[in-house]
C-alpha cells in the first residue's frame, strides 16, 4: 500500500522563507524543508554540528549538505545566538532551547500565513521526494538517514506522479 504525501507549494514556501531570513521560524522551516531534518533533530541540533567550512550539518547518523539559504540563515543566527546557547534553535524571548511543541507552533504559524496545510514531517517528506528527483537511492538514503528499502517502499509510488 502506497503512502500519500501532503506537499507544500514551492512558491509559497519561498515567500515564507523570504519573510523569515534568519528568525527561528526561518531556521526551523529551512532545516525541515531544505535539509530534511525531523522535529527532534531540529530541537536537538547544536552549533558544533553545523560545519560552515565543510558546508554540512553533521547529525549522529548522517551528514546533510547545507543549502545556501540555510547556510545564510544559520550564519546570521550563529552571530546572534551562538554565545547564548549551544542549540541552534532557541527562543528569542527566553534565549533557551525551544521545546518541540514551540517548534511545531512557530512553523505552523509561518506555514498558515501562506495557506500551507503541511507540517514539519510533510516538509521532511518533500525534501526526500525532491532529492529522489535529482539523486540516486543510496545518496538519498545517506542524506535522509532512511534505509534504501524504506525509501523505495514509501516513495517509489509518488515518483511516478512528479
Describe each region flagged by the PLM:
Residues 161-162:
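Conserved small/polar residues in nucleotide/adenosyl-binding loops
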Residues 104-144:
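Short, basic (Lys/Arg/His-rich) helix/loop patches that form interaction surfaces
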Residues 1-13, 60-69, 82-86:
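DNA breakage-rejoining catalytic core of tyrosine-based enzymes
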Residues 28-29, 40-45, 140:
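Alpha-helix N-cap/helix-start motif at helix boundaries, enriched for small hydrophobics
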Residues 50-52, 117, 136-156:
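Short, polar N-cap/turn motifs at the start of nucleic acid-interacting alpha helices
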Residues 6-39:
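Basic, Lys/Arg- and aromatic-enriched nucleic-acid-binding interface segment
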Residues 35, 40, 44-74:
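Conserved tyrosine-mediated DNA breakage-rejoining catalytic core shared by Y-recombinases
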Residues 67-116:
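Active-site/catalytic core of tyrosine-dependent DNA strand-transfer enzymes
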Amino acid at each position: 500500500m502506497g503512502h500519500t504525501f501532503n506537499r507544500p507549494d514551492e512558491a509559497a514556501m519561498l515567500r515564507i522563507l523570504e519573510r523569515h531570513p534568519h528568525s527561528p521560524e526561518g531556521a526551523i522551516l529551512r532545516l525541515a524543508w531544505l535539509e530534511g531534518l525531523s522535529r527532534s533533530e531540529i530541537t536537538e541540533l547544536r552549533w558544533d554540528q553545523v560545519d560552515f567550512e565543510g558546508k554540512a550539518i553533521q547529525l549522529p547518523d548522517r551528514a546533510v549538505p547545507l543549502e545556501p539559504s540555510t547556510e545564510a540563515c544559520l550564519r546570521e543566527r550563529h552571530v546572534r545566538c551562538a554565545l547564548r546557547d549551544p542549540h541552534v534553535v532557541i527562543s528569542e524571548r527566553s534565549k533557551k532551547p525551544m521545546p518541540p511543541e514551540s517548534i511545531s507552533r512557530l512553523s505552523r504559524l509561518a506555514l498558515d500565513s501562506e495557506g500551507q496545510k503541511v507540517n514539519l514531517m510533510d516538509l521532511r517528506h518533500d525534501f526526500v521526494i525532491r532529492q529522489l528527483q535529482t539523486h540516486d537511492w543510496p545518496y538519498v538514503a545517506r542524506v535522509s538517514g532512511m534505509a534504501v528499502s524504506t525509501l523505495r517502499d514509501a516513495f517509489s509510488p509518488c515518483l511516478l506522479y512528479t
